[in-house]
């Protein structure tokens, strides 16, 4: 069974209108030729093809949120329960590239990156993946963006002071405006301080910090928001150097308070476990904003809407052909 997608419907309609309104032979000939050219450009999607399933690695907070929300908790950390020959993406950007280049692929990405991804975002339980629908509670596939920070800076007192200032900056009107611009979902209540109103609490902000490097990392889904925030804050705090190395949510705690000790600020696209494996110190972590997760397919795919049950059946290997899920 094959579904045909008409990528240039408006153009075809315009040609038909032109042909009906202009009786000249030359115009009619041109219209017919153009119509034939449009027909040759029809994109065909074969639903009898096997679904190519993509996932993130077990270090990913997006994978954690995605699998948990669709009721497939056992797949958060265990690849053995997933469909055979599943492919793994190294990050949010890598997932986007894989789906863009695989006509029969399916995966999941951060809503904050959907608009510029070139992928098709699917409805979830009948609801479009939009910021408005996350805010009104109708779109259920979402999670928080969070941060955690180092608590022992040793002799790096300048870094520690900059990190403390950065955490306070996150609650300002300026920072929240930036997060919203980066598609983070949150409200500005009007009660937030401005940076100017709290800057005097952080003397480090008036110093020349151009030779001080602060290390940021963690979630690849939060990377865009994190980079925008540090780019904004650096000139407000002595032009410190922000070094970003994002390898997944699992590295956020490990890098700041765990065994790796290679980050000063870590970002997560899930909640901290707050167990023995992620025993973050009270007051050293918090929420940035909300972000949704979107199931995505290639633009030529005729699949438009999905459900938790359908996604789970694809990722578990119960359904392997596109015809199994496309009516």
Residue ranges and their predicted role:
Residues 1-5:
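Positively charged n-region of N-terminal signal peptides that target proteins for export
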Residues 6, 10-15:
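Hydrophobic helical h-region of N-terminal Sec-dependent signal peptides
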Residues 11, 21-22:
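Terminal disorder- and signal-encoded targeting elements
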Residues 16-20:
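C-terminal motif of bacterial Sec signal peptides marking the signal peptidase cleavage site
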Residues 22, 26-327:
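Flexible loop/hinge segments at secondary-structure junctions
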């Amino acid at each position: 069974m094959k579904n045909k997608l008409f990528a240039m419907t408006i153009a075809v309609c315009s040609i038909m209108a032109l042909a009906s309104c202009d009786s000249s032979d030359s115009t009619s000939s041109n219209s017919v030729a153009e119509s034939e050219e449009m027909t040759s450009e029809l994109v065909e999607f074969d639903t009898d093809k096997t679904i190519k399933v993509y996932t993130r690695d077990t270090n990913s907070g997006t994978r954690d949120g995605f699998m948990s929300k669709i009721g497939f908790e056992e797949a958060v950390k265990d690849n053995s329960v997933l469909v055979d020959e599943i492919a793994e993406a190294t990050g949010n950007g890598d997932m986007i590239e894989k789906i863009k280049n695989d006509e029969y692929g399916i995966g999941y990405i951060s809503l904050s990156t959907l608009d510029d991804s070139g992928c098709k975002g699917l409805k979830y339980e009948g609801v479009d993946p939009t910021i408005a629908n996350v805010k009104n509670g109708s779109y259920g596939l979402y999670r928080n963006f969070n941060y955690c920070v180092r608590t022992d800076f040793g002799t790096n007192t300048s870094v520690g002071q900059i990190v403390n200032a950065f955490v306070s900056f996150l609650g300002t009107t300026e920072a929240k405006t930036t997060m919203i611009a980066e598609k983070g979902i949150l409200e500005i209540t009007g009660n937030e301080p401005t940076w100017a109103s709290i800057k005097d609490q952080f003397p480090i902000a008036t110093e020349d910090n151009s030779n001080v490097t602060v290390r940021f990392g963690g979630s690849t889904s939060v990377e865009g928001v994190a980079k925008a925030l540090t780019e904004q804050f650096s000139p407000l705090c002595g032009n410190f150097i922000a070094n970003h190395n994002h390898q997944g949510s699992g590295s956020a705690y490990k890098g700041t308070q765990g065994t790796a000790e290679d980050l000063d600020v870590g970002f997560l696209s899930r909640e901290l476990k707050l167990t023995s494996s992620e025993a973050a110190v009270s007051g050293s972590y918090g929420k940035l904003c909300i972000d949704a997760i979107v199931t995505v397919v290639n633009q030529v795919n005729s699949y438009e809407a999905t459900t938790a049950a359908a996604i789970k059946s694809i990722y578990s290997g119960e359904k392997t052909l596109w015809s199994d899920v496309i009516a």
